[in-house]
């Protein structure tokens, strides 16, 4: 009877990660927009440059461990060896050259891929104002006069200028197949410029944890033809609901897994209202603090004046007492 090898199953278990990872979609390495393609090139280039150092180190570590193993009595032993100009040149020169190249690439790509930098194109861009809520995305099209929740559309080969803010905690706006992510924060506006090189439906996500409904805070980004975009706008304008500053408080209430929702019209001032209401809140707090501080200062000054008056009164009483106690000169 042969004994079962407890390690025999490990070689089959080692295939499990490959099988599981086979179902994963490498979204970042399958970009559908120019910004995403440039970022993929940057990631691959930087990784290959670093592998110039990493791979030789791994190979030499394994080679030296094998060559100088205890059973290899033929390996040359040099106990007095301590320096080599060639080795010093390689271990210093190669990393320095790689760092210099990476530095140049970083400088160039940082400016080229700046999310605030408008994309070079002769086509008029589409402007979309994005607001992160709990737990959904509100999108306003100021030029078309419409708004949506958890769905956007735009023509392919057309720059899309996103103006992003938050009406809740800090969040992050991200369409992985199109390019960069950018944070959304209450009381301030961030910008992002993207473009789709082909038609398709791309997943948009929140890339920053924001509470219980975070996992369902997803939206669809539809890149279509110019005619397809106009048809989509017409469909939204046919929706029965509208969005105004008065009805907005109902929308902003926390909700999870919200389906795409259309608003046929939207108040032109809504995005500005969302953007500035936290600034006014800060001003009000500052004014209240100033009034409180002024009241404290006035009370302190009043108390100080009263203390001075009390001291003067006590001094006057002391002087009168001294006068009564002095003997008369006639006596």
Curated annotation (Swiss-Prot):
It is a multi-pass membrane protein. Residues 63-86 are cytoplasmic. Disulfide bonds: none annotated. It is found in: Cell inner membrane. GO terms for cellular component: plasma membrane. Residues 24-41, 108-331 are periplasmic. A lipid is attached at residue 24 (N-palmitoyl cysteine). The keyword Oxidoreductase applies. GO terms for biological process: ATP synthesis coupled electron transport. A lipid is attached at residue 24 (S-diacylglycerol cysteine). Residues 1-23 form the signal peptide. The chain crosses the membrane at residues 42-62, 87-107. Keywords: Cell inner membrane, Cell membrane, Electron transport, Lipoprotein, Membrane, Oxidoreductase, Palmitate, Respiratory chain, Signal, Transmembrane, Transmembrane helix, Transport. Its main location: membrane. Gene3D superfamilies: 1.10.287.90, Cupredoxins - blue copper proteins. GO terms for molecular function: copper ion binding; cytochrome bo3 ubiquinol oxidase activity; cytochrome-c oxidase activity; oxidoreductase activity, acting on diphenols and related substances as donors, oxygen as acceptor. It holds the Pfam family COX2. PROSITE patterns: COX2_CUA, COX2_TM, PROKAR_LIPOPROTEIN. Cytochrome bo(3) ubiquinol terminal oxidase is the component of the aerobic respiratory chain of E.coli that predominates when cells are grown at high aeration. Has proton pump activity across the membrane in addition to electron transfer, pumping 2 protons/electron. Heterooctamer of two A chains, two B chains, two C chains and two D chains. Belongs to the cytochrome c oxidase subunit 2 family. This is Cytochrome bo(3) ubiquinol oxidase subunit 2. It comes from Pseudomonas aeruginosa (strain ATCC 15692 / DSM 22644 / CIP 104116 / JCM 14847 / LMG 12228 / 1C / PRS 101 / PAO1). The lineage of its organism: Bacteria, Pseudomonadati, Pseudomonadota, Gammaproteobacteria, Pseudomonadales.
